Amino acid sequence: MGCSVSKKKKKNAMRPPGYEDPELLASVTPFTVEEVEALYELFKKLSSSIIDDGLIHKEEFQLALFRNRNRRNLFADRIFDVFDVKRNGVIEFGEFVRSLGVFHPSAPVHEKVKFAFKLYDLRQTGFIEREELKEMVVALLHESELVLSEDMIEVMVDKAFVQADRKNDGKIDIDEWKDFVSLNPSLIKNMTLPYLKDINRTFPSFVSSCEEEEMELQNVSS
């Protein structure tokens, strides 16, 4: 039953902008109600790390990923932008859970493929152009600290783009991307986070605190 009882007992508690009911989020993501509530505890920590307003700002997102809000990375920026569905410069709780759901081991592969396509579509045109592919490749290499010469990067990008752009029109559409990923599944390997399959084990302190809170409520009502 998790913390659902304790949450319902606090109907008057202030909720941040974009807060969505855990039961609703559980119905549209691979997470259970209890796991959504555990993610809310994580969300509260992230959203108050710099600005305590119940929203995750890009600097807070950078801090969570790199422990350094001043370190810029195109890949991290793109993840933030795709999480920010409303495109208002912040990540709300509902957006946080729904987007994380794509990284769940049980999430459908087509959702992971679609999410990855959005990451590479830097200019949000509905297509991935060669320069966008190169920018993302460079960002990923930088993040992995793998050093390649400019010539090697060009060869890598050219080979990938030719393979993906089957229509030879200078851009990769979503259908071409799906085919490309099916031939190169490693492209979405990082789209799965195993620990999301068992949030309760990932955040044991939260689970234990919830159980204690429920026991207290039962004692009060008995």
Curated annotation (Swiss-Prot):
InterPro entries: CNBL1-10 (IPR045198), EF-hand-dom_pair (IPR011992), EF_hand_dom (IPR002048). Changing residue 205 to A: Loss of phosphorylation. Its cofactor is Ca(2+). PROSITE patterns: EF_HAND_2 (PS50222). Keywords: Cell membrane, Cytoplasm, Lipoprotein, Manganese, Membrane, Myristate, Nucleus, Phosphoprotein, Repeat. Binds 4 Ca(2+) ions per subunit. Disruption phenotype: Delayed development and flowering. It is a lipid-anchor. Pfam families: EF-hand_5, EF-hand_7. The modification Phosphoserine is found at residue 205. Belongs to the calcineurin regulatory subunit family. Acts as a calcium sensor involved in the regulatory pathway for the control of intracellular Na(+) and K(+) homeostasis and salt tolerance. Binding of a CBL protein to the regulatory NAF domain of a CIPK serine-threonine protein kinase lead to the activation of the kinase in a calcium-dependent manner. Operates in synergy with CIPK24/SOS2 to activate the plasma membrane Na(+)/H(+) antiporter SOS1. Involved in salt stress responses by mediating calcium-dependent microfilament reorganization. The calcium-binding domain (165-176) of the EF-hand 4 can also interacts with a manganese ion. The N-terminal 18 amino acids are sufficient for the cell membrane targeting of a heterologous protein. This is Calcineurin B-like protein 4. It comes from Arabidopsis thaliana. The gene is CBL4.
